[in-house]
A protein has these predicted regions:
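Short S/T/G/P-rich N-terminal loop/turn motif that feeds into the first structured element of a domain
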Residues: 1-57, 66-72, 100-101
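C-terminal structural segments of small proteins and small subunits
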Residues: 68-89, 93
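Short alpha-helix boundary/capping motifs
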Residues: 89, 99-100
Length: 101
């Protein structure tokens, strides 16, 4: 099993929306990837709580794949590429980690 974890920091305002509005749209689009990319075994998306440290990242994605080959299929999938194109102008920073469980 391979875990793929990505965190994004978002601009305060981007594309005419607030950070919170964009975070909610990002979450919706990410969760929808499970319906489009069968290689995703599990998917979870979190938005940093307003009660949490404001220095935390704004949005986190946690996905699981059977192997690195499935992760590669996911990353090249047109639905994932569409998401990358959508999120890029909204984010100020991104980090990611991929590891085997």
């Amino acid at each position: 099993m391979v875990k793929h974890i990505v965190c994004w920091n978002l601009f305060e305002n981007a594309k005419g929306k607030t950070k919170q509005q964009n975070a909610l749209e990002i979450k919706e689009k990410l969760l929808d990837l499970k319906n489009k990319i069968p290689q995703i075994q599990t998917i979870e998306v979190g938005i940093n709580s307003d009660k949490a440290n404001p220095d935390n990242y704004d949005v986190v994605l946690i996905t699981e794949f059977n192997n690195f080959e499935d992760l590669e299929v996911y990353q090249k999938h047109p639905a994932h590429q569409d998401f990358v194109e959508f999120v890029t102008p909204l984010r100020s920073d991104k980090i990611a980690v991929d590891f085997e469980k």
